Amino acid sequence: DGYFVLPFTVGNYLGEVRTLPPLAEDHADVSQAVAAVEERIKKLMNAPHPKPAPEHFHRLLGKIIWTKCGMSRSKEGLEEALREIPKLRDQFWREVKITGSGETLNQTLERAGRVADFFELGELMWIDALKREESCGGHFREEYQENGEALRDDEHFSYVAAWEWTGNPSEPRLNKEPLSFEYVKPSKRSYK
């Protein structure tokens, strides 16, 4: 639907490749993408037991993110969240209520699509945070600190994590791009 949140560098890249010729409407990739979107809309519009609006699930998911995967995280909280999210996501797909039609502009449908995406993104955030057994920047783990200071593990976590979609939001594949430090070496920081 044209809604993107991207790092600045990705936008620059897309700006450079926009000169590629557009795909024809009957191209296999276009047909496949259209069919996938239509199937998703149909699934969203036809929840078996529609009750609450997308905002209800958005609030519940947001509360879990805020309390269990905020700036300060713990293994226990992350594991608990990873048990809660699939249950809430299943409830969302069974019960989300979308008024109106899937054939015209429908802001409730747009919101539901975003919330469905947030479930996948949120779960990935928790998986990544649980796997990163250190405290560094936005990855502060309560069990990895020393005298109140973040305890980094540069030996095991000096990499860029690129998570790959496998078709199951609970089982992404981690691809690591090692970081090399030629000019400036990592050093211990003090926030005191």
Can you name each region flagged by the protein language model?
Residues 1-192:
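Glycine- and aromatic-enriched mobile tails/lids
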